[in-house]
């Protein structure tokens, strides 16, 4: 009986995660008290930071909230920080929590409009280079005002929908009836080459779209959660943030869009595959049937969502309220005028954001430990001993390398908090502080496209339903992101070092 209970407990601990991963987390939990008792709080604090970064890097094995949360509960019990310090950290960053709670949910109710736009572009543009550029531009524009995860989710939804239609037709099934999309056994030999080509076509479009969210997300206060966090620390509103980061973000945006076109024209790194004509004919016929069947209520819903999007952009530009409250307004407007009054339908809009919001609380708990143990103070002090003109570039590199393997919100939180403390201590001027803030913001946003771990949108794409269908693996994502990483990361460093 005891063996079965032990086995059940071991199986339930962290669920379907590999046994080696469970063993590593248990080792961390045993190691931390020993380090605290033998070497001291600084060593235990650094161990905690490294362990938490490990959980972020292994996000595909287990969502970091559970293992990271266990580590932080232990840190609280070991008094490496206090519940009061965590509460004050959350209170200080409350606008970011509001953003994730309400803005992401608000954009959820615009999905039909966004899906309509991406579908029209996909079928209306025949040039692959122009189509890729439009996907990248639209993703960048939407991510500058909306939420990158939601924009990525919409692109994925469009891709899954189109893939499902053609896969069913190629399998001899009704395109409007459910079928197994993960098996090619029923696909006629005649259609197999076209299906594989269509997969490569969708892979390239999805990667362009995901990179577009990073290109646009770095530009504005609401583009990424860490932007709002940094803007809040600096006292910047929407227009302030846009102008401060423009010397870096605008050149990088232009270079990223140029890279998109060149990759398609030169057919490098897995890009350049065209949509087979047979696939286009099937999808166009399906879309025409959908248009004919669209009801008046559905058309009105699209207009309401479009008007709400316009109001959202105006309110953000004028900073009429905190970003999260504007998101709540969008929820009220769209649901009130489209007849969404059921509590369960409302609740689904919050499902995507709440896990990450909970994880963000764990981020801030780690930051509270870092503050209490002063872990990053020596590093920041060393950077500040460098000549002033070298400091932005060095911070950019430090942020970029860590953001590529960890979560950029976590990295940005650590660095902006430590640099602000140095500013408050009189170690730099306000102008130099703003320069370093831009370096931290761009350093966490641009080089982090190198791996799926760095960008939430990339990780979301990798773990989505479409990834196995179109054969998009971790390694393939890294390979396809490589040219963007070099261009965006390299030009970003140059701009931070020489143009700020």
UniProtKB/Swiss-Prot annotation:
A single GO molecular function term of this UniProt record: sodium:proton antiporter activity
Catalytic activity: 2 Na(+)(in) + 3 H(+)(out) = 2 Na(+)(out) + 3 H(+)(in)
Taxonomic lineage: Bacteria, Pseudomonadati, Pseudomonadota, Gammaproteobacteria, Pseudomonadales
Keywords assigned by UniProt, alphabetized: Antiport, Cell inner membrane, Cell membrane, Ion transport, Membrane, Sodium, Sodium transport, Transmembrane, Transmembrane helix, Transport
Keyword Repressor on entry: no
UniProt-listed NCBIfam families: PRK09547.1 (NF007093)
Record InterPro entries: Na+/H+_antiporter_NhaB
Subcellular location: Cell inner membrane
Keyword Zinc-finger: no
Name of the protein described by the UniProt record: Na(+)/H(+) antiporter NhaB
Family: Belongs to the NhaB Na(+)/H(+) (TC 2.A.34) antiporter family.
Cellular compartments per GO CC: plasma membrane
